[in-house]
């Protein structure tokens, strides 16, 4: 237990970090259920939490409000704890259209989904780490409160093999089939097994690039080895191995049979209800759909939409909470909720939206009432299951403020950087004044963020600035995650100088190059101009030594006053600390790649950086062929969330298209 977690870093805690670390550790050791780390932008909150984890030596679940932030946190913790099981647990859907029915137009929408296999593998790897290891750190999104396979059923389906034990080949193959592995005679892929005589090759569903070889002799396990499925090279001989199921929803045969019987009973009860209400179409529809599912479960052990029968598969009572990732956590685990002012309300809002859609499906005979128990956790259920918790935010929400037993403040940054100076200027001349400021900041080699209230205003401002020779881009809600990452990358690289948007605070990403944040119409009260939003937006300039914020307003609203007072309080504390310790503020020097470090660090190690080929002497046919090849690569990387690689290929792709146009 002495060195269960070990941080690898060139830095030591500084600024307010040592005090915050000591305060949080003391709170955890005293048994406090909920604490808050109130840390300003750029104060090293992740580093503080890493030290808390190292000191407490407990498995940890870290929840972020979106995949982008989760990927960033995963990259940071992976760098801090290279020897530990840092895992990634987010929704594995690239695209998801839930099953739904619209009574007004009598339209039924079938469930349609595209699953990202690599993220599915990482989810399986995350639960495996929680089961097998004490040094697990899981970075997750709100996906953690959604139904997952029952841990008891999952554990009962594990396949344990040891060298020298008696084991019949047919039994092993049967168990692999029950675990939903598929047999192949071709190249081995994840979730498959292959048989050659007495040799069984298995590619575990939770493994990224290593497979297992089982060699049998006379119904005895003669040898177990890890090998590379691509080259066939033996990597390591093993005394024993545990193969985990292909999916979290795998269920023992006897539980499937029990489920089928319970579903039949519920079906008869529901049909009687519908017939009594003279809902004959709904009754016929329900009987047809449910009988088909029953047949599939009996034949294959699963069916499409099997999660709708999860109440019976996990042996729960009606209304009982579904098993989730929280059921895989050991009792001594820690829970860290990042950007809690966003994440906590998000957790609270998931249940109702899901419930409304499913009630329609039940009422119109598409699903049995038990399908309502395939749902995310209610907020009170989430609270019951949460272990000791630390909320992290620069602007904690009302829930954290009310329920936290201890607030550790982290206002002083290790770099000595001070919160941006805030100026208030009149609305009347805001556009002309802004343009003047933009030109000054660009001349210094820095970048600018501008936040507006409406989409229309953002578009008009972008067009106006562009007409006046300023390199500007517009970030809005229709931009998907990959493109959003590319836009932020391009801003940092200087491809353009000004980013205009409506809600630029939701990224939570590091942009040290931003020296000016301009907030237009700051005196219009509302969500986008609340105290919390203003503090978060002003904080976007806090990573730059010359960071400033300009609020364009004719009156000072209550939210503005509170935000200004809090910012000034922080500035005074930071200045006093710097003066007392003789610290000169230093800018953050962070490479552009750092922002994009996410869930694919392991993969990137195998990529060799090649010099861009010279295409000047290529024929149009060769260029077209290369453009098509690059386009496929670009979309493949983007689909796998490999943002950095996708962006690099995109740059080359655009160069080639430009060259082709000149021919």
From Swiss-Prot:
GO biological process, one term: SOS response
Limits of the Helicase ATP-binding domain: 26-414
Domain Helicase C-terminal, residue spans: 430-596
One Pfam family named in its UniProt record: Helicase_C
Record's subcellular location: Cytoplasm
Motif Beta-hairpin: positions: 92-115
Sorted UniProt keywords: ATP-binding, Cytoplasm, DNA damage, DNA excision, DNA repair, Excision nuclease, Nucleotide-binding, SOS response
Keyword presence, Transcription: no
Keyword Metal-binding on entry: no
Binding-site list for ATP: 39-46
GO cellular component, one term: excinuclease repair complex
Residue ranges constituting the UVR domain according to the UniProt record: 624-659
InterPro entries, A to Z: Helicase/UvrB_N (IPR006935), Helicase_ATP-bd (IPR014001), Helicase_C-like (IPR001650), P-loop_NTPase (IPR027417), UVR_dom (IPR001943), UVR_dom_sf (IPR036876), UvrB (IPR004807), UvrB_inter (IPR041471)
GO MF annotations, alphabetized: ATP binding; ATP hydrolysis activity; DNA binding; excinuclease ABC activity
PANTHER family tied to this protein: UVRABC SYSTEM PROTEIN B
Quaternary structure and interacting proteins, as annotated: Forms a heterotetramer with UvrA during the search for lesions. Interacts with UvrC in an incision complex.
Family of the protein in this entry: Belongs to the UvrB family.
Domain notes: The beta-hairpin motif is involved in DNA binding.
Function comment: The UvrABC repair system catalyzes the recognition and processing of DNA lesions. A damage recognition complex composed of 2 UvrA and 2 UvrB subunits scans DNA for abnormalities. Upon binding of the UvrA(2)B(2) complex to a putative damaged site, the DNA wraps around one UvrB monomer. DNA wrap is dependent on ATP binding by UvrB and probably causes local melting of the DNA helix, facilitating insertion of UvrB beta-hairpin between the DNA strands. Then UvrB probes one DNA strand for the presence of a lesion.
The name this protein goes by in its record: UvrABC system protein B
Native source species: Legionella pneumophila subsp. pneumophila (strain Philadelphia 1 / ATCC 33152 / DSM 7513)
Encoding gene (name): uvrB
């Amino acid at each position: 237990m002495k060195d269960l977690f070990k941080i690898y870093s060139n830095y030591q805690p500084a600024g307010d970090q040592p005090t915050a670390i000591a305060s949080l550790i003391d709170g955890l050791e005293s048994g406090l259920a909920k604490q808050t780390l109130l840390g300003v932008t750029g104060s090293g909150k992740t580093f503080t939490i890493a030290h808390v984890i190292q000191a407490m030596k407990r498995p940890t679940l870290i929840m972020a409000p979106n995949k982008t932030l989760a990927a960033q946190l995963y990259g940071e913790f992976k760098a801090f704890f290279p020897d530990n099981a840092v895992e990634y647990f987010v929704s594995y859907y690239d695209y998801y259209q839930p099953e739904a029915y619209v009574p007004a137009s009598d339209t039924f929408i079938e469930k349609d989904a595209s699953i990202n296999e690599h993220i599915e593998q990482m989810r399986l790897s995350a639960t495996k780490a929680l089961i097998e290891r004490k040094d697990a750190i899981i970075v997750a999104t709100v996906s953690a409160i959604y139904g997952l396979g029952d841990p008891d059923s999952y554990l009962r389906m594990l396949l344990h093999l040891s060298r020298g034990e008696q084991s019949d080949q047919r039994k092993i193959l049967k168990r692999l089939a029950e675990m939903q592995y598929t047999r192949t005679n071709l190249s081995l892929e994840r979730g498959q097994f292959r048989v050659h005589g007495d040799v069984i090759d298995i590619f575990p569903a939770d493994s990224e690039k290593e497979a297992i070889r089982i060699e049998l002799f006379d119904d005895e396990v003669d040898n177990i080895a890890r090998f590379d499925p691509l080259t066939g090279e033996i990597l390591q001989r093993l005394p024993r191995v545990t193969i985990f199921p292909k999916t979290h929803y795998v269920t023992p045969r006897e539980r499937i049979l029990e489920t089928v019987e319970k579903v039949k009973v519920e079906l008869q009860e529901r049909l009687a209800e519908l017939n009594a209400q003279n809902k004959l179409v709904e009754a016929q529809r329900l009987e047809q759909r449910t009988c088909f599912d029953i047949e599939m479960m009996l034949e294959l052990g699963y069916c499409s939409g099997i999660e709708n029968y999860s109440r019976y598969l996990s042996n729960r009572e009606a209304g009982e909470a579904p098993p989730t990732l929280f059921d895989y956590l050991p009792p001594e685990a820690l829970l860290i909720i990042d950007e809690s002012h966003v994440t906590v309300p998000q957790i609270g809002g998931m249940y109702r939206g899901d419930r409304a859609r499913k009630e329609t499906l039940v009422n119109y005979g598409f699903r049995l009432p038990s399908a309502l128990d395939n749902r995310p956790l209610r907020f009170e259920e989430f609270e019951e299951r949460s272990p000791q918790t630390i909320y992290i935010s620069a602007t904690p929400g009302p829930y954290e403020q009310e329920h936290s037993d201890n607030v550790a403040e982290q206002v002083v940054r290790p770099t000595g950087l001070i919160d941006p100076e805030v100026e208030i200027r009149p609305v009347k001349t805001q556009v002309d004044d802004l343009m003047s400021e933009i030109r000054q900041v660009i001349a210094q080699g820095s970048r600018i963020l501008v936040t507006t209230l409406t989409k229309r205003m953002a578009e008009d401002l972008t067009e106006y600035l562009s007409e006046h020779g300023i390199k500007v881009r517009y970030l809005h809600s229709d931009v998907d995650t990959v493109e959003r990452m590319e836009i932020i990358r391009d801003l940092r690289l200087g491809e353009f100088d000004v980013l205009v948007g409506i809600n630029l605070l939701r990224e939570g990403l590091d942009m040290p190059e931003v020296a000016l944040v301009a907030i237009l119409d700051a005196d219009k009260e509302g969500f986008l101009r609340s105290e919390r939003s203003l503090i978060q937006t002003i904080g976007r300039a806090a990573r730059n030594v010359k960071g400033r914020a300009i609020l364009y307003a004719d009156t000072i609203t209550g939210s503005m006053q509170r935000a200004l007072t809090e910012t000034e309080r922080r500035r005074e504390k930071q200045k006093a600390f710097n003066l007392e310790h003789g610290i000169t503020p230093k800018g953050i020097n962070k490479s552009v790649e750092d922002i994009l470090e996410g869930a694919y660090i392991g993969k990137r190690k195998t990529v060799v950086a090649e010099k861009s080929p010279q295409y000047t002497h290529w024929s149009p046919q060769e260029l077209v062929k290369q453009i098509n090849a690059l386009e496929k690569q670009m979309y493949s990387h983007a689909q796998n969330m490999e943002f950095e690689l996708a962006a690099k290929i995109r740059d080359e792709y655009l160069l080639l298209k430009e060259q082709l146009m000149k021919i």
